[in-house]
């Protein structure tokens, strides 16, 4: 891995809010024990709020948004993951408090990650997003004899 990579960085100085794709250094990623090469991310409603003006969800600037991402483990200090593991990250306030997935690389706590099911690709995982992944996890764990009701609410 090169020490420099691209990330969408938001910043707020006084009343001035900015978004910019920047070349940053690996040392910029200050949280976590697992480094992931991000393959895909999503644009969630919460991401849109954060990208507009921080939405009072982001407390420290500069910041990398992106609440969901899927990718491949590059480095790990955790016993839970090893180099080459394909992972999914959703929730845990990543993209709000912790740096998120709008970056070529992300560094997060191992507890925030799950191994990607082999039945789906990283792209498919991010096409589903947080709500879809929750539903699919339920479907994978439901017994064949059980009925599962999936509801969807779309706000336009």
Residue ranges and their predicted role:
Residues 15-21, 54-55:
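Short gly/ser/thr-rich secondary-structure transition/capping motifs
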Residues 3-8, 34:
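Short structural boundary motif marking the start of a folded domain
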Residues 90-150:
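NAD(P)H dinucleotide-binding glycine-rich loop of Rossmann-like/cofactor-binding domains
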Residues 25-43, 54-94, 120:
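Glycine-rich beta-strand-centered segment in the early N-terminal region that forms part
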Residues 46-51:
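Cytochrome P450 core scaffold surrounding the K-helix E-X-X-R motif
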Residues 19-21, 26, 70-72, 105-107, ...:
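Conserved hydrophobic/aromatic beta-strand scaffold that supports enzyme active sites
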Residues 154-156:
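Conserved small/polar residues in nucleotide/adenosyl-binding loops
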């Amino acid at each position: 891995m090169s020490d420099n990579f691209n990330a969408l960085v938001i910043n707020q100085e006084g009343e001035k809010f900015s978004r910019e794709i920047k070349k940053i250094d690996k040392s910029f990623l200050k949280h976590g024990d697992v480094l992931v090469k991000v393959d895909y991310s999503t644009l969630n409603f919460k991401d849109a709020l954060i990208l507009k003006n921080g939405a009072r969800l982001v407390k420290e600037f500069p910041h990398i948004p992106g609440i969901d991402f899927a990718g491949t483990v590059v480095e790990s200090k955790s016993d839970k993951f090893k180099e080459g593991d394909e992972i999914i990250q959703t929730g845990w306030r990543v993209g709000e408090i912790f740096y998120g997935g709008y970056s070529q690389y992300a560094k997060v706590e191992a507890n925030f990650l799950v191994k990607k099911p082999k039945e789906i690709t990283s792209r498919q995982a991010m096409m589903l997003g947080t709500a879809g992944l929750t539903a699919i996890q339920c479907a994978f764990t439901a017994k064949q004899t059980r009925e599962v009701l999936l509801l969807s609410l779309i706000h336009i």
